Curated annotation (Swiss-Prot):
It comes from the Bacteria. It comes from Shewanella sp. (strain W3-18-1). Belongs to the GTP cyclohydrolase I family. The lineage of its organism: Bacteria, Pseudomonadati, Pseudomonadota, Gammaproteobacteria, Alteromonadales. This is GTP cyclohydrolase 1. InterPro entries: GTP-CH-I_C/QueF, GTP-CH-I_N, GTP_CycHdrlase_I, GTP_CycHdrlase_I_CS, GTP_CycHdrlase_I_dom. Toroid-shaped homodecamer, composed of two pentamers of five dimers.
Length: 214
């Protein structure tokens, strides 16, 4: 299946900036990946002394394989990049467009546990305007990978800058990391905030403040 024009542009922009998720070219189909993950997951669970003949566990390796490929790591495959609707800004709209409280669930690439949070996105329209739901879908696409929050924030910024043909984009993410909450230090109250600012959001203090403190 050929990649969409939007997917090709975004991937190229991330590679150029050194912001692409570290990954190898895939040599397997989705079903082949599921079969191999299922096989190895059986070995892992058996090494953990779990009895896979039990009704509750028998299908767990396959469920995990399907979850990895079709859901929580589906953003590793650019064939899943969302269909993007970008239109010419014929009405000359030039005020800030802001979408806040976008829910995101990702996976920490260090321990493969949950990152749970929200994103706020803003841009100043220039030549192009994007369908609002597409912003949410772009966040979700890049969240559905093993991630670090700093890179995720930058990936969403670059994707929107590329598609909107403007640097004037800002991204803010607030998230709870379960690698901190459920293991290690086991801090159940802390959260992490990251920002990525481009164009006027970086150069103009008033615009930056409006985005960050609204």
């Amino acid at each position: 299946m050929a990649l969409s024009e939007a997917a090709v542009k975004v991937q190229a922009a991330l590679l150029e900036r050194g912001l692409e998720t570290p990954m190898l070219p895939s040599v397997y189909s989705s079903e082949e990946r599921k079969d191999k993950i299922e096989h190895h997951m059986k070995e892992i669970l058996t090494l953990m002394s779990l009895d896979l003949s039990d009704d509750s566990l028998a299908d767990t390796p396959r469920r995990i394989a399907k979850m990895y490929v079709d859901e929580i790591f589906s953003g590793l495959d650019y064939e899943n990049f969302p269909k993007i609707t970008v239109i010419d800004n014929k009405m000359g709209f030039d005020e800030m467009v802001r979408v806040q409280d976008i829910s995101l669930t990702s996976t920490c690439e260090h321990h493969l546990v949950t990152i749970d949070g929200t994103a706020t996105i803003a841009y100043l329209p220039r030549k192009k305007i994007i369908g609002l739901s597409k912003i949410n879908r772009i966040v979700r696409f890049f969240a559905q990978r093993p991630q670090v929050q700093e890179r995720l924030t930058q990936q969403v910024l670059v994707a929107l800058q590329t598609l909107l043909e403007t640097k004037d984009v800002a991204v803010k993410m607030d998230a709870v990391h379960y690698c901190v909450k459920s293991r290690g230090v086991m801090d159940s109250t802390s959260s992490t905030t990251t920002t990525a600012l481009g164009g006027i959001f970086k150069s103009n203090p008033a615009t930056r403040a409006e985005f960050l403190h609204q």
